């Protein structure tokens, strides 16, 4: 469960572009990575809620928030939202690669909404995502 006693902080990491430091992606046995599909807002909301995000909001409210925030950008979701899915087609983890506006107007790449269902943590799903 997400420890809400730890204050929230944005973390900015920079990479020097040295490809030699990249590690291969190792997807845990029994999982595959897949991109967003129509209707995945339900999976996204369920995973985020199970990971402790969105506090007292219901699952339906969390899904509605997602649709309000990202619903008009479904084309971008198809290549910016990634799910870890078990062989029985259960989505157990999610992350999004998005962009944020910088103070100078530039677009800054952002990895956010990385979450794994509590029952599936510790299996390498988050690392693969």
Question: Could you say what each language-model-derived stretch is?
Answer:
Residues 44, 104-109, 120-124:
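Extended hydrophobic-aromatic, low-complexity segments
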Residues 18, 38, 102:
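Residues that form or immediately flank small-molecule/cofactor binding pockets and catalytic motifs
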Residues 32-46:
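A short beta-loop-alpha structural element at the N-terminal edge
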Residues 113-116, 122-129:
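Conserved acetyl-CoA-binding loop-helix of GNAT-fold acetyltransferases
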Residues 49-116:
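A conserved beta-strand-loop-helix scaffold within acyl/acetyltransferase catalytic domains
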């Amino acid at each position: 469960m997400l420890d809400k006693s730890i204050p929230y902080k944005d973390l900015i990491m920079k990479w020097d572009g040295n490809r030699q430091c990249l590690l291969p992606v190792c997807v845990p046995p029994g999982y595959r990575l897949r991109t967003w599909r129509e209707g995945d807002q339900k999976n996204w909301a369920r995973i985020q809620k199970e990971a402790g995000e969105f506090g007292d909001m219901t699952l339906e409210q969390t899904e509605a928030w997602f649709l309000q925030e990202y619903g008009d950008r479904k084309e971008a979701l198809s290549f910016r939202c990634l799910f870890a899915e078990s062989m029985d087609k259960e989505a157990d983890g999610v992350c999004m690669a998005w962009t944020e506006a910088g103070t100078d107007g530039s677009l800054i790449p952002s990895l956010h909404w990385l979450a794994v269902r509590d029952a599936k943590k510790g299996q390498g799903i988050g690392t693969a995502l």
